[in-house]
């Protein structure tokens, strides 16, 4: 059952299969159009140092980029950032980078910020950011090697080199935060906003 009331579907400015699945499972009609932006260049030039603020900025920029090329459409942008011991992590560069990420996060608690924004005709209508506290268990070199062998290259698409919805769940001893946000999309606040605008039938 589709609950989206507008004649034209939403646009998700992301190629993330997990975010697409979350929207589809919630009954939202949408199409995915990834934003062709340089995330690291924006991050360097924006002058922001907080992981939460950077996540919001990137979510907004993704949505704005696609919105300006899609008149009249509601566009969702989303982003995640990870902070651990004062260090801001980017998506790992290949398997070697993923292993380095996991070594740095092993035995520590990190903050995972998930942001979502909605833009229409270049105008930002909504933004939200949440934080989850993720405690990774102590990982041996053998465990890291075995995990990367089993999980494959897909882990490099995640800022923390793990996917909690898959084998990444084995890496953690404690997780505190909203499940949807950890997967990459603060879904409940997003749905609440769309509902408040009369855009959903439920």
From Swiss-Prot:
Its cofactor is a divalent metal cation. It is found in: Cytoplasm. One of its GO terms (molecular function) is nucleoside triphosphate diphosphatase activity. It is an enzyme of class 3 (hydrolase). The active site is at residue 79. InterPro entries: ITPase-like_fam, Maf-like. Pfam families: Maf (PF02545). GO terms for cellular component: cytoplasm. One of its GO terms (biological process) is nucleotide metabolic process. Keywords: Cytoplasm, Hydrolase, Nucleotide metabolism. Its EC number is 3.6.1.9. It catalyses: a ribonucleoside 5'-triphosphate + H2O = a ribonucleoside 5'-phosphate + diphosphate + H(+); a 2'-deoxyribonucleoside 5'-triphosphate + H2O = a 2'-deoxyribonucleoside 5'-phosphate + diphosphate + H(+). HAMAP family: Maf (MF_00528). Belongs to the Maf family. Nucleoside triphosphate pyrophosphatase. May have a dual role in cell division arrest and in preventing the incorporation of modified nucleotides into cellular nucleic acids. This is Nucleoside triphosphate pyrophosphatase. It comes from Nitrobacter hamburgensis (strain DSM 10229 / NCIMB 13809 / X14). The lineage of its organism: Bacteria, Pseudomonadati, Pseudomonadota, Alphaproteobacteria, Hyphomicrobiales.
């Amino acid at each position: 059952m589709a609950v989206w009331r507008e004649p034209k579907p939403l646009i998700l400015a992301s190629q993330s299969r997990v975010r697409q699945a979350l929207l589809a499972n919630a009954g939202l009609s949408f199409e995915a159009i990834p934003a062709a932006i340089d995330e690291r260049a924006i991050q360097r030039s924006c002058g922001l140092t907080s992981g939460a603020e950077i996540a919001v900025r990137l979510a907004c920029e993704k949505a704005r980029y696609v919105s300006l090329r899609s008149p009249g459409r509601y566009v969702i942008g989303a982003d995640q950032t990870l902070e651990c011991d004062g260090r801001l992590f980017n998506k790992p560069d290949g398997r070697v980078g993923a292993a380095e990420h996991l070594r740095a996060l092993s035995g520590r608690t990190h903050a995972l910020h998930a942001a979502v924004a909605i833009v229409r005709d270049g105008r930002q209508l909504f933004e939200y950011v949440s934080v989850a506290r993720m405690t990774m268990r102590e990982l041996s070199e053998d465990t890291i090697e075995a995990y990367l062998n089993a999980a494959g290259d897909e882990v490099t698409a995640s800022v923390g080199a793990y996917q909690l919805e898959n084998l990444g769940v084995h890496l953690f001893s404690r997780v505190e935060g909203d499940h949807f946000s950890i997967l990459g999309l603060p879904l409940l606040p997003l749905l609440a906003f769309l509902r408040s605008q009369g855009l959903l039938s439920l």
